[in-house]
């Protein structure tokens, strides 16, 4: 006899979002790309680590490109066609992520750099000596 109970899962709501926002967080160690609707609700997201890149490979331009493509494809399935892009962080994946978005056929309406700049806040990490 099979007495295992099936897990109850919510069905994903298909919604049509023609325009939205794309937030690219490009740090030195990883790249996170989030696609949202105009209200800020997440439509899709992806990151280099989520796609199987490990360690120092997560911060590479190629990893950023793959992450942006993945997030854009998921968003296009939800009907997204155009985005406002918000960039944050000093990472190497900034430019490749934007190029990958454009290459998937997503229309980029605007580009904004929202990298937080301290008014001389915390002391930065010491320089690496290799």
From Swiss-Prot:
Q: Which residues form a coiled coil?
A: none
Cellular component annotations (GO), alphabetically ordered: ribonucleoprotein complex; ribosome
InterPro entries referenced in this protein's UniProt entry, alphabetically: Ribosomal_uS11, Ribosomal_uS11_bac-type, Ribosomal_uS11_CS, Ribosomal_uS11_sf
| Gene Ontology molecular-function annotations | rRNA binding; structural constituent of ribosome
One GO BP: translation
Mind listing the UniProt keywords for this protein, alphabetically? Ribonucleoprotein, Ribosomal protein, RNA-binding, rRNA-binding
The domain of life for this entry's organism is Bacteria
Role summary: Located on the platform of the 30S subunit, it bridges several disparate RNA helices of the 16S rRNA. Forms part of the Shine-Dalgarno cleft in the 70S ribosome.
Query: What protein family is recorded?
Result: Belongs to the universal ribosomal protein uS11 family.
Complex formation:
Part of the 30S ribosomal subunit. Interacts with proteins S7 and S18. Binds to IF-3.
HAMAP family from the UniProt entry? Ribosomal_uS11
Q: What name does UniProt use for this protein?
A: Small ribosomal subunit protein uS11
| Species of origin | Bdellovibrio bacteriovorus (strain ATCC 15356 / DSM 50701 / NCIMB 9529 / HD100)
- Gene that encodes it: rpsK
């Amino acid at each position: 006899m099979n007495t295992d109970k099936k897990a109850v899962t919510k069905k994903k709501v298909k919604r049509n979002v023609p325009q939205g926002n794309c937030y690219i967080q490009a740090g030195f160690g990883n790249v996170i790309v989030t696609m949202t609707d105009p209200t800020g609700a997440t439509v899709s997201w992806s990151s280099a680590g989520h796609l199987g890149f490990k360690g120092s490979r997560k911060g590479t331009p190629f990893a950023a490109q793959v992450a942006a493509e993945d997030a854009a494809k998921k968003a296009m399935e939800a009907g997204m066609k155009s985005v406002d892009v918000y960039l944050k962080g000093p990472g190497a994946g900034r430019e490749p992520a934007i190029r990958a978005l454009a290459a998937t056929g997503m229309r980029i309406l605007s580009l904004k750099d929202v990298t937080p700049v301290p008014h001389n806040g915390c002391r930065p990490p010491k320089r690496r000596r290799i």
